[in-house]
Amino acid sequence: TIYQLRSGDIKITDISAASPKNIATINSDDGFAASELYLHDGKLIVIGTRQMFYPMAERIAPDIMPMPPMRPKTRIYFYDVTAPESPKLIRKFEGDGSYMTSRLAEGSLYMVLNKPIATYSMTAESVLPAFTDTLMSSNGNAVSRSGIGFESLRYFPDTVESNLMITLGFDLELMNKAPHKMAYLGSSTNLFADSESMIVALDRYHYDYRAQGGITMPVFANTTELYKFLL
């Protein structure tokens, strides 16, 4: 069976016969852009970003069009595909921030999100990441909401980015178990993971602040720092 991620949907094709046959199609919700999928032990995991746009609170005078307020959110869909011709949604998870990267290792899914901190009209609510976890069942959907408080925020030394790096860890064998969540002041685009540890790579720019006799180009050194987390 082939699972093909396309623009707007996922096509499931049976290739066991002489002629391939489309047996199911999973359509995406409005505003959701899938970017990655995993297949593990009868489960299909679809990861993507959903843009949240909000209308202006009040009418403004004619002027240059402002950037519309938007809050990127990462959404993960978990499907039961033990019967590929009838995929069944069993869980939906949504969290603040843009999806950066993920790794699947030994039945666990590890993920990194980046949440920009908007300094304009900043509030405590806008800084702290929030999450919504929905479990589907025949008896109805169970929705739980959670977040990460200021007392749980961590930071990387010498961080200057106004950004939160959020790490998520899902146990794919226990769909009812809440994911492990952490948030760090800083940002990263590279993640390495195995069954025992996760390594995050961060770019660092070291500027030369020595006084110059005239106007010169700024001098800096670019390095990469690695941080290892035990899983």
Model-derived segments and their meaning:
Residues T1-L231:
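Beta-sheet-rich non-transmembrane sensory/scaffold domains
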